[in-house]
UniProtKB/Swiss-Prot annotation:
UniProt topology in membrane: Multi-pass membrane protein
Subunit structure: Component of the ER-mitochondria encounter structure (ERMES) or MDM complex, composed of mmm1, mdm10, mdm12 and mdm34.
Signal sequence interval, chain numbering: none
Keyword Disulfide bond among UniProt keywords: no
Residues of the SMP-LTD domain: 1-205
Biased composition annotated in UniProt, kind: Low complexity: 320-332, 452-463
Keyword DNA damage set for record: no
Function: Component of the ERMES/MDM complex, which serves as a molecular tether to connect the endoplasmic reticulum (ER) and mitochondria. Components of this complex are involved in the control of mitochondrial shape and protein biogenesis, and function in nonvesicular lipid trafficking between the ER and mitochondria. Mdm34 is required for the interaction of the ER-resident membrane protein mmm1 and the outer mitochondrial membrane-resident beta-barrel protein mdm10.
Protein name: Mitochondrial distribution and morphology protein 34
InterPro entries reported for this sequence: Mdm34 (IPR027536), SMP_LBD (IPR031468)
């Protein structure tokens, strides 16, 4: 079924259609760039009518019709609009960018309004239309989908690319709303005007009422203010106010000067970083002195005062200083004096909150004292430091000795640390130094209390170890202590703690001695009745648990034999005592040359 459109009468009268389009375009919310009404200045439907394809006929009669059509239009119709826009290219560009990628600056303090003319042409439409016609109710046309395919937008800003693209996108969006919502209402009113005489009469009456409306706009500055003042701030009476001319500028200058100054300050604050800037959305103020931030406001959330900020800085500074001191193994005084932390420098330079500085320093001193006390107590009670075996050139130094070196000798004289059975992988600390079980250890650098035994420089490493073993294995009655008087002839018997200490000191040092050195050392301290295992050469060459057990057994046998000799007769003890005392005077190495050959060993 074909339709013949009589297109010429529709082209002839388009004034009413222009008015309806203007009303429809201004009804919907406009973008912020458009600052004036949109006026349709020209509407030309062109010479090519649209094409309709019948899909369904629902109702067909003489006075009514209902059907579904497929419409397509590719004619030469065009539409010209005029409006005013705010010409701020940077603001227009930023409105197209995402918020997270734009700093939102302003290009100008005030907007610049420029007239804009837009022409819409090359309109392409395609969609499904529901058409209902009735002589009493007029023509109703509804689009089931968005019919706008494309159009061309020509404007005054075609030379600016991003403004042209922005206008193209915005106008396409407005036209899609126009076709879906406003165009059916416009067509329906036009059909009623042409078909229904009653609607024509109602419309004529509305036009007459609009023309007779002579309501003038009210000027807020036309009436005199209540607290009128002159240019110098003096109040005016009613007679002076009535004498003024309403058209002159005197009536406008009679407003309160206080309010005018406040309005001027408010206007100027929008262009500066003044503290009087009111609350603006998406704005960050450099200073804020609002009511909730004051101390006397009683707000639920406590404000960050200067003292609280300094306490926060002190907390972070103390944590940093504590971590650095633990990592370096230095004392608390060295950390505070040599490397001041962030909190101490901040408090010293700015002079903020002395109370917070004292609490910070007290906390740091308490932390340092606790670390030192733990290490001192650990070394004095157990004498065991659980760490891995270190090689011979060890560089680790005890923290206790570095903190309090002057109190080391006093603690040696007073405290006797208990010992435990030697275990592989353990490190033992005694009064004379520290040693690692299972690995050779160097002689401690600090001088012992009875130092004349090692006064001459040793020539052979084994000789120094023999001197060390001789000093530790011999009973306490034969030792010389420079701090003890020599008037006493009798000595107390050897204690169990000293015996175990001698065993620990003897075991790693005798391991590197040859068998003849061990035999000569045994001949100095005991009669030739000491029993030794027949395979001593094999055991001396091989290390491990068997060698340590044999060394302990030999030391116990030596101590037992010495105790028996002491109990037998005092006459045999005095020559041995004088023999031992001649060693420091004549030198240890001279006495070693007089050592006889080792006696025979009995199994």
């Amino acid at each position: 079924m074909a339709f013949n459109f009589n297109w010429s009468p529709l082209i002839a009268d388009t004034s009413r259609a222009r008015d309806m389009l203007t009303t429809a375009l201004n009804k919907s919310p406009k973008p912020p760039i458009i600052v004036d009404d949109i006026i349709v200045t020209e509407l030309n439907l062109g010479t090519t009518p649209p094409e309709l394809e019948i899909l369904e006929i629902g109702d067909l009669a003489e006075d009514r019709f209902r059907g579904i059509f497929k419409m397509s239009y590719a004619g030469d119709a065009f539409l010209t609009l005029k409006t005013k826009v705010q010409a701020n290219p940077l603001k227009t560009y930023l409105s197209n960018k995402p918020d997270f990628a734009s700093p939102q600056p302003l290009a100008a303090a005030a907007g610049l309004t420029i007239p804009l003319q837009i022409t819409l042409s090359n309109i392409r439409l395609s969609g499904f239309v529901i058409l209902v016609f009735s002589k009493q109710k007029g023509l109703t046309l509804v689009f089931r989908n968005d019919p706008l395919e494309s159009l061309k937008v020509s404007s005054t800003f075609d030379s600016i690319p991003f403004v042209r693209d922005y206008l193209q996108k915005e106008i396409e969006g407005q036209l899609r709303v126009l076709f879906m919502e406003d165009l059916p209402a416009i067509i329906h009113r036009l059909s009623l005007r042409m078909l229904s005489p009653e609607y024509q009469e109602i419309e004529t009456e509305e036009r007459l009422e609009g023309a007779n409306d002579t309501t003038a706009a009210i000027d807020p500055l036309a009436s005199p203010p209540e607290d009128a003042v002159d240019a110098f701030g003096n109040p005016l009476d009613e007679a002076q106010i009535s004498a003024m001319s309403l058209d002159s500028g005197e009536i406008h200058a009679s407003f309160s000067q206080k309010n005018i100054l406040r309005l001027a300050a408010l206007s100027e604050s929008q262009r500066t970083l003044s503290l009087f800037t009111p609350g603006i959305r998406e704005a960050v103020f450099r200073a804020w002195a609002g009511h909730p931030d004051r101390a006397e406001s009683g707000a639920a959330t406590p404000a960050l005062t200067q003292g609280s900020l300094s306490r926060i800085q002190s907390t972070f500074g103390s944590l940093k200083s504590g971590a650095s001191s633990v990592a370096s193994g230095s004392t608390g005084n060295e950390t505070l004096s040599s490397r001041p932390t962030l909190a101490s420098s901040y408090s010293t330079s700015a002079g903020i909150s002395l109370g917070s500085g004292r609490s910070r320093a007290g906390g740091m001193r308490k932390r340092k004292k606790r670390v030192v006390d733990l290490r001192r107590k650990d070394g004095a009670d157990s004498g065991v430091s659980t760490e891995a075996n270190t090689p011979l050139p060890s560089t680790q130094v005890s923290d206790t000795s570095s903190v309090i070196p002057e109190e080391r000798e006093a603690e040696e004289e007073l405290a006797t640390p208990p010992t435990s059975p030697p275990q592989p992988g353990r490190r033992f600390e005694s009064r004379r130094g520290s040693l690692d079980v299972g690995t050779p250890k160097r002689i401690p650098e600090e001088p012992p209390t009875f130092g004349p035994l090692l006064a001459p420089a040793p020539l052979i490493p084994n000789a120094s170890k023999a001197a060390k073993s001789k000093r530790t294995v011999s009973p306490p009655a034969h030792l010389e202590d420079p701090f003890v008087s020599h008037t006493s002839s009798r000595r107390p018997p050897i204690s169990r703690n000293k015996l175990r200490q001698a065993q620990q000191s003897t075991s790693p040092l005798l391991r590197s001695l040859s068998f003849d050195k061990v035999s000569s050392l045994s001949a100095l301290c005991s009669p030739p009745r000491i029993s030794s295992p027949p395979n001593a050469d094999l055991m001396s060459s091989s290390g491990g648990i068997l060698e340590q057990a044999w060394m302990q057994k030999m030391a116990q046998e030596i101590a037992r034999k010495v105790q028996e000799e002491k109990d037998k007769s005092s006459g045999q003890r005095r020559p041995s005592h004088s023999r031992t005392k001649t060693a420091p005077t004549g030198g240890f190495w001279q006495g070693e040359d007089e050592v006889e050959a080792p006696p025979a060993y009995v199994a």
